[in-house]
A protein has these predicted regions:
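Alpha/beta-hydrolase active-site loop signature
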Residues: 51, 84-88, 151, 242
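Alpha/beta-hydrolase active-site loop
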Residues: 63, 93-114
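Glycine-rich "HGGG/HGxG" loop immediately N-terminal to the catalytic nucleophile
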Residues: 82-96
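N-terminal cap/lid segment of alpha/beta-hydrolase-fold proteins
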Residues: 1-39
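The alpha/beta-hydrolase serine catalytic core
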Residues: 3, 10-14, 24, 138-237, ...
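Primarily recognizes the serine-hydrolase "nucleophile elbow" in alpha/beta-hydrolase
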Residues: 105-165
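Short, surface-exposed "cap/lid" segments of acyl-processing enzymes
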Residues: 32-74
């Protein structure tokens, strides 16, 4: 795929990534000028998960934008968030392979952003799983932090029609004729497996954070991912925490600490 010719706003803010078949909504947070160190800054792409509820205008966007602003302010990094196809103001329809392609575009965009010297990725739930996959496939990614990430998506593929119906209900499949090929759509759910790719990331940095009481993705998934990376990970299990860790102050503190420990 040819990288899109996109220049995010110099001072940060919302912008669009226009591609041949879709437009992706994105947001860039920059630290205050006083936080700059050296000639370049580290960059982080933050990925959201699969929505649990029908969309409320810009609600999820605001939450991730606020997280990006905080991370940039606290760490001095340039932080980019992306709305995957079918979510928020991004066009298109959900497919797992499509979301992974969107993340790869975001990595390209951030790497080409003036002032960014290297890129890490971070994600929550499905976004964390895709962040692992992207890091496993792209050696330019310097490290990954994944929160509540599933080890694979095989359970979704077992009843693809039901999952399509769920995706329609939460608004990430908008075209009534999509997917044209249900089996090909479901095949991506079986073949895109963080469990198969996380072992390609070390010695690059990996942070896995999971809630001990996660009611959606078992904490066993985090332990399986850690084992698949030959235990070359920082694994943190948060007592009493459930699935949604984006607003858990302990999870955010772990992310900020991990970012601060990344080398030049």
């Amino acid at each position: 795929m040819t990288s899109p010719a996109v220049t995010p706003p110099a001072g940060g803010g919302a912008f669009s990534i226009a591609l041949e078949d879709r437009t992706l909504a994105a947001y860039l947070a920059r630290p205050a000028p006083s936080a700059a160190t050296g000639s370049g800054r580290h960059g982080l792409v933050v990925c959201h998960g699969f929505p649990a509820d029908p969309p409320q205008p810009n609600a999820a966007n605001r939450g991730y934008q606020q997280l990006a602003d905080r991370l940039a302010a606290d760490t001095g990094w340039v932080v980019m968030t992306l709305s995957f196809r079918g979510t928020s103001e991004s066009t298109g329809n959900f497919s797992l392979g499509g979301w992974l392609a969107d993340l790869k575009v975001a990595i390209d965009v951030l790497l080409e952003t003036p002032g960014v010297d290297a890129v890490w990725v971070c994600g929550f739930a499905a976004g964390g799983a895709l962040a692992i996959c992207a890091a496993g496939e792209d050696p330019r990614v310097r490290g990954v932090a994944a929160f509540s990430a599933p080890a694979d998506f095989a359970d979704r593929a077992t009843d693809a029609r039901r999952f399509v119906a769920q995706a329609r209900a939460v608004g990430v499949i908008r075209d009534p004729a999509f997917p044209a090929d249900l089996e090909a759509w479901a095949r991506e759910l079986r073949e895109i497996r963080p469990l198969n790719l996380i072992g390609k990331i070390p010695p690059r940095s990996i942070l896995l954070v999971h809630g001990a009481n996660d009611e959606v993705v078992s904490v066993l998934d985090a332990r399986a991912l850690a084992d698949a990376a030959y235990a070359q990970v920082e694994l943190r299990v948060l007592p009493g925490a459930g699935h949604r860790l984006r607003n858990d102050p302990r999870a955010v503190a772990l992310l900020i600490g991990w970012m601060d420990r990344q080398g030049g």
